From Swiss-Prot:
NADP(+) binds at A239, I242, E245, R262, R268, G334, L381, V414. Catalyzes the reduction of glutathione disulfide (GSSG) to reduced glutathione (GSH). Constitutes the major mechanism to maintain a high GSH:GSSG ratio in the cytosol. The active site is at H511 (proton acceptor). Binds 1 FAD per subunit. It is linked to Anemia, congenital, non-spherocytic hemolytic, 10: An autosomal recessive disease characterized by hemolytic anemia and impaired activity of glutathione reductase. Patients experience hemolytic anemia in response to oxidative stress or ingestion of fava beans. This is Glutathione reductase, mitochondrial. It comes from Homo sapiens. One of its GO terms (cellular component) is extracellular exosome. PROSITE patterns: PYRIDINE_REDOX_1. PANTHER family: GLUTATHIONE REDUCTASE (PTHR42737), GLUTATHIONE REDUCTASE, MITOCHONDRIAL (PTHR42737:SF5). The gene is GSR.
């Protein structure tokens, strides 16, 4: 047993050597199970403090690491840093700014713009609350400058965190090679590792010119953050959460906004109550929702863009119309995986028909030693999901936690619409499909939040609880209204823990709040 303290100390950082000494006496009292000794030695040896990287490889040499991460977005960075904490020699390949979509052209700058839009909405309520009306003109350039500066600070923080973790940043595009063991090439140099993670994310989808002539005249959500001024006239195409968020922001800030959707409701994959209510709230807020409509052609004119569309209401003849003088045409029709230039075929890495990398529940691809997390996998395209999956993977690979994997069930999500949406678990239709209609019961409510008790402007708050089986286990919660974005997290914990309707009923309400409705549903 005396060998075990030495094994714990060998190659470990100072903190782990101190821990080994502290437990020496305790360990000497233990029996001598060889399997336990080997497992502890291996685990402690890997959990050493991050060490500085060695010198760069000589020209023509192949640099070797314990862990190579392709993609410096949220999932890749989280996985690399956790691996480094566990003692792995890691490197991240990135060709653009650190932080990926979320930090640079997604969640973070979008939330800044959403906050700006919410501020604009509340300004309309000032007089109702006894303050003089605020007639100040919105200055797009001011918030753009502050937003971009904030993003730049986050980029620097990511850079600093990698440096502190002794993780090397390899700048450039990575592509797999045909070498005998998994190898990538970046700017003419080769790098290899027994474990390679693909975390390249996704990018906005746009129609091809052959499908819609002039489609390239529009922008995507990426381009939204490059706009130098507020568009006077905006047309958003799409019915998903990005389309809903962009339309809400632009409209609230003063752009005349149309949202073009192929069916009659937005967010059709959400619970039907949310889909219906969100569509109504958009219209109530002044967004023109063009239902059963699609863009046919886009032309550039002296006064902006001319968007031709066809509206095909079921049971009626299609009608062609044109929207003139459009300043901003924004495509929000989905996202595609960023795998085009990775040369996945050289290793035979399998993808689905949309290009998403196919992985199992442990994030393994079909090629040993190659893994994928995040949007590139096409499942639950959310930053916290990529981060959690990446960290779980690092623990499995470098801490020998063989069962470490992300549970993709009951993942909460928020749509920053106006008002915001919060949802976790199964929709009513999904619950019926899983448990049978006779085993599903729903509880719902609709009310005006107290904030609007004295305002001319009104928004609703709607809530639905989906319960299953005799014990009425809560399998889904869906809500839209003021504050729903912030109140969901706690209720998501309850759903994840398997709470029942009775558990909610036995919780004393907080009054007066909107959240109390979920513990008083009847």
């Amino acid at each position: 047993m005396a060998l075990l303290p030495r094994a714990l100390s060998a190659g470990a950082g100072p903190s782990w050597r101190r821990a080994a000494r502290a437990f020496r006496g305790f360990l000497l009292l233990l029996p001598e199970p060889a399997a336990l000794t080997r497992a502890l030695s291996r685990a402690m040896a890997c959990r050493q403090e991050p060490q500085p990287q060695g010198p760069p490889p000589a020209a023509g040499a192949v640099a070797s690491y314990d862990y190579l991460v392709i993609g410096g977005g949220s999932g890749g960075l989280a996985s690399a840093r956790r691996a480094a904490e566990l003692g792995a020699r890691a490197a991240v390949v990135e060709s653009h700014k650190l932080g990926g979509t979320c930090v640079n052209v997604g969640c973070v700058p979008k939330k800044v713009m959403w906050n700006t839009a919410v501020h604009s909405e509340f300004m309309h309520d000032h007089a109702d609350y006894g303050f003089p009306s605020c007639e100040g003109k919105f200055n797009w350039r001011v918030i753009k400058e502050k937003r971009d500066a904030y993003v730049s600070r986050l980029n620097a923080i990511y850079q600093n965190n990698l440096t502190k973790s002794h993780i090397e940043i390899i700048r450039g595009h990575a592509a797999f090679t045909s070498d005998p063991k998994p190898t990538i090439e970046v700017s003419g140099k080769k790098y290899t590792a027994p474990h390679i993670l693909i975390a390249t994310g996704g990018m906005p989808s746009t129609p091809h010119e052959s499908q819609i002539p002039g489609a390239s005249l529009g922008i995507t959500s990426d381009g939204f953050f490059q706009l130098e001024e507020l568009p006077g006239r905006s047309v958003i195409v799409g019915a998903g959460y990005i389309a809903v968020e962009m339309a809400g922001i632009l409209s609230a800030l003063g752009s005349k906004t149309s949202l073009m959707i192929r069916h009659d409701k937005v967010l059709r994959s959400f619970d039907s109550m949310i889909s219906t209510n969100c569509t109504e709230e958009l219209e109530n807020a002044g967004v023109e929702v063009l239902k059963f409509s699609q863009v046919k052609e886009v032309k550039k004119t002296l006064s902006g863009l001319e968007v031709s569309m066809v509206t095909a209401v079921p049971g009626r003849l299609p009608v062609m119309t044109m929207i003139p003088d459009v300043d901003c045409l924004l495509w929000a029709i989905g996202r595609v995986p960023n795998t085009k230039d990775l040369s996945l075929n050289k290793l035979g890495i399998q993808t689905d028909d949309k290009g998403h990398i196919i992985v199992d529940e442990f994030q393994n691809t079909n090629v040993k030693g190659i893994y994928a997390v995040g949007d590139v996998c096409g499942k639950a395209l959310l930053t916290p999901v990529a981060i959690a999956a990446g960290r779980k993977l690092a623990h499995r690979l470098f801490e020998y936690k063989e069962d470490s994997k992300l549970d993709y069930n009951n993942i909460p999500t928020v749509v920053f619409s106006h008002p915001p949406i919060g949802t976790v678990g199964l929709t009513e239709d999904e619950a019926i499909h899983k448990y049978g209609i006779e085993n599903v019961k729903t509880y719902s409510t609709s009310f005006t939040p107290m904030y609007h008790a004295v305002t001319k402007r009104k928004t609703k708050c709607v809530m639905k609880m989906v319960c299953a089986n005799k014990e009425e286990k809560v399998v889904g919660i869906h809500m839209q209204g003021l504050g729903c974005d912030e109140m969901l997290q706690g209720f998501a914990v309850a759903v994840k823990m398997g709470a029942t309707k009775a558990d909610f009923d036995n919780t004393v309400a907080i009054h007066p709040t909107s959240s109390e409705e979920l513990v008083t549903l009847r």
